[in-house]
């Protein structure tokens, strides 16, 4: 993948008449491809509209990027989990070669990222948003190991915070309880809601670096859970009824009817019984 990235960048330099192209990477977190119009076009109806035809979200800006550029329809993550997939993205290596094959394992010091290569070629490099490659730190603002991202003031290691603010000591989570950061919305508005806040900071950086070649990565922590958002978006789709996917109904029906020993009849010969139904990773991935 690393070679592919740089072949792509080199090809862009020819497209732009030998000039160094600017690079902007916008990354979202657990974003179901069915929520993007540009991907629904490539799916069968039963896959594209698993929640119903009347409940889809329109994504005109993302769709226009796909139409005017290119869209990957055969692109797979070596590990569809946060830390390892991010490690692969910035390094071009398989997760097991980065030191980060599972969540919360820090990237090896020896890893060379695309940002480091571009920085050495004169690019202004910056990173905003969720990083998740610096171990357990949470939120972990501006890690000391920058991996080529010269400006990482607005990089935080992990967490899905909903409210940010600036202080004299730098950025911090705005929603707090007992002076500790929480995932609550708090008083988040169009200036402090996490996505809005990060986008505003990215625009400031783009304005600062506009007269030089730049590479900026904006890693938005949404739409990963908790599934909370500021108004007007919080109530925007309250009137819609989402259909449960057919495959989910089938699986739940099978679970409902099995196993027989869970019933009172099936367990009558047990003097004492403890029934535990445990679910792993039950959140809807969007």
Predicted regions and their residues:
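Short, well-ordered alpha-helical scaffold segments within catalytic/effector domains
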Residues: 3-5, 111, 195-203
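Sec-dependent N-terminal signal peptides
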Residues: 2-13
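Catalytic-site neighborhoods of secreted/periplasmic enzymes
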Residues: 85-191, 231
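Active-site-proximal cap/lid insertion segments
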Residues: 21, 30-56, 158-197, 203-286
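Active-site segment of extracytoplasmic enzymes that catalyze sulfate/phosphate-ester chemistry
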Residues: 21, 25-28, 32-127, 136
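Glycine-rich, histidine-containing beta strand-loop boundary motifs that form or position
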Residues: 76, 128-129, 156, 218-220
């Amino acid at each position: 993948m690393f070679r592919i990235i740089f072949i792509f960048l080199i090809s862009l330099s020819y497209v732009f008449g030998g000039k160094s192209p600017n690079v902007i990477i916008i990354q979202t977190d657990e974003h179901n491809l069915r929520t993007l119009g540009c991907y629904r076009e490539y799916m069968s109806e039963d896959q594209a509209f698993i929640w119903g035809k009347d409940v889809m979200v329109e994504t005109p800006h993302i769709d226009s990027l796909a139409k005017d550029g290119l869209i990957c329809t055969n692109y797979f993550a070596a590990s569809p989990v946060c830390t390892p997939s991010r490690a692969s993205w910035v390094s071009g290596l398989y997760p097991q070669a980065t030191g980060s094959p599972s969540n919360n394992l820090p990237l090896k010091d020896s890893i060379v990222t695309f940002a480091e290569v571009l920085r050495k070629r004169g690019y202004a490099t910056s990173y905003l948003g969720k990083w998740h490659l610096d171990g357990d730190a949470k939120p972990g603002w501006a890690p000391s190991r920058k991996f080529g991202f010269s400006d990482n003031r607005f990089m935080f290691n992990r967490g899905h915070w909903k409210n940010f603010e600036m202080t004299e000591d730098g950025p911090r989570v705005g929603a707090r309880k007992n002076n500790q950061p929480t995932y609550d919305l708090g008083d988040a508005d169009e200036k402090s809601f996490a996505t809005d806040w990060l986008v505003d900071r990215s625009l400031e950086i783009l304005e600062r670096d506009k007269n030089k070649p730049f590479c900026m990565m904006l890693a938005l922590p949404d739409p990963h859970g908790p599934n909370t958002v500021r108004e007007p978006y919080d109530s925007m789709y309250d009137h819609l009824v989402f259909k449960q996917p057919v495959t989910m109904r089938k699986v739940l029906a099978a679970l409902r009817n099995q196993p027989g020993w869970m019933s009172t009849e099936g367990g009558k010969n047990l003097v004492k019984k403890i029934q535990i139904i445990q679910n792993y990773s039950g959140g809807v991935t969007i």
